């Protein structure tokens, strides 16, 4: 007769839980606590002063601009790509999916170098812009291109499985009833994919605001001009302006917390709708 040593099983279970919690505390929680401590251990006033710095405000504004540019563009692209890939089988589909995932696998620094080679003054495309006295690299357009590159797959990758699970039956039924394509999208497709879409938009926004590597390569990292919040943190820390650096890091951390809360809410809503 098979017997189970329950006390031993429980010991292993709680040992694994303790190890996992210890690892999470050591790798994630303690560094976050350290950042908040360094930002506020002298009181709130240094933090407020850091937030009033013109370079910080410029970095915050530029970070928001990067998100405002990249999120709508990649949302539209992601919806189109997701619909094409979920609703059609065609030669090269696997290649399309592989290229779509490229920003996940390639180093952001390498991505930045690719953009510099292409859009620099001597690049294939950048030389044409240079002839019109338009600067791409070391300016806002280059930073926007880099941000768009690294955030490209998120919406598509969240919407594709939702569309595949949904199937084309409802859309085809609406079409047989005389609905036009735009009516089908707004009244049938979009309501069914809205939570997956919002989840993808949320991830895109979080990555856009937190991106460092690719943007640092193409921006030139000029304080007050081409410095986003992550770049501002790195520059101020290197310049021994620790209060400003940790203050900006706290802002980024708070944005991450808000993202996590919204992510959890969307996951619960998505799970609820799947269950229904």
UniProtKB/Swiss-Prot annotation:
The gene is cysW. Part of the ABC transporter complex CysAWTP (TC 3.A.1.6.1) involved in sulfate/thiosulfate import. Probably responsible for the translocation of the substrate across the membrane. It is a multi-pass membrane protein. Keywords: Cell inner membrane, Cell membrane, Membrane, Sulfate transport, Transmembrane, Transmembrane helix, Transport. Pfam families: BPD_transp_1. Residues 60-267 form the ABC transmembrane type-1 domain. Its main location: membrane. Belongs to the binding-protein-dependent transport system permease family. CysTW subfamily. GO terms for cellular component: plasma membrane. PROSITE patterns: ABC_TM1. The keyword Ribosomal protein does not apply. This is Sulfate transport system permease protein CysW. It comes from the Bacteria. GO terms for molecular function: ABC-type sulfate transporter activity. PANTHER family: SULFATE TRANSPORT SYSTEM PERMEASE PROTEIN, SULFATE TRANSPORT SYSTEM PERMEASE PROTEIN CYSW. The lineage of its organism: Bacteria, Bacillati, Cyanobacteriota, Cyanophyceae, Synechococcales. The chain crosses the membrane at residues 16-36, 64-84, 99-119, 136-156, 212-232, 242-262. It is found in: Cell inner membrane. SUPFAM superfamilies: MetI-like. It comes from Synechocystis sp. (strain ATCC 27184 / PCC 6803 / Kazusa). InterPro entries: CysW_permease, MetI-like, MetI-like_sf, Sulph_transpt2. The complex is composed of two ATP-binding proteins (CysA), two transmembrane proteins (CysT and CysW) and a solute-binding protein (CysP). NCBIfam families: 3a0106s02, permease_CysW.
């Amino acid at each position: 007769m098979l017997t189970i040593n329950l006390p031993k099983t429980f010991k292993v279970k709680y040992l694994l839980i303790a190890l996992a919690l210890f690892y999470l505390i050591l790798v994630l929680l303690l560094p976050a606590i350290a950042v908040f401590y360094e930002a506020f251990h002298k009181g709130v006033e240094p933090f407020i002063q850091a937030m009033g710095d013109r370079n910080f405000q410029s970095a915050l504004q530029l970070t928001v601009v990067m998100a405002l540019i990249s999120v709508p563009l990649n949302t539209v692209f992601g919806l189109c790509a997701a619909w094409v890939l979920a609703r059609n089988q065609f030669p090269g589909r696997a290649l399309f999916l592989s290229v779509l995932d490229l920003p996940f696998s390639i180093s952001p620094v390498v991505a930045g170098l690719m953009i510099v080679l292409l859009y620099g003054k001597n690049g294939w495309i950048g030389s044409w812009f240079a002839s019109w006295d338009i600067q791409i690299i070391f300016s806002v357009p280059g930073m926007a291109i880099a941000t768009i590159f690294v955030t490209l797959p998120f919406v598509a990758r969240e919407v594709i499985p939702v569309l595949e699970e949904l199937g084309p039956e409802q859309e085809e039924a609406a079409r047989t009833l005389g609905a036009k394509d735009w009516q089908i999208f707004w009244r049938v497709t979009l309501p069914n994919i809205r939570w997956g879409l919002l989840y993808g938009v949320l991830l895109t926004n979080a990555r856009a605001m937190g991106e460092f590597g690719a943007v640092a390569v193409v921006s030139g990292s000029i304080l007050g001009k081409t410095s986003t919040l992550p770049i501002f943190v790195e520059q101020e820390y290197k310049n021994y302006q620790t209060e400003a650096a940790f203050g900006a890091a706290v802002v980024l951390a708070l944005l991450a917390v808000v993202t996590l809360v919204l992510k959890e809410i969307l996951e619960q809503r998505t799970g609820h709708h799947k269950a229904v």
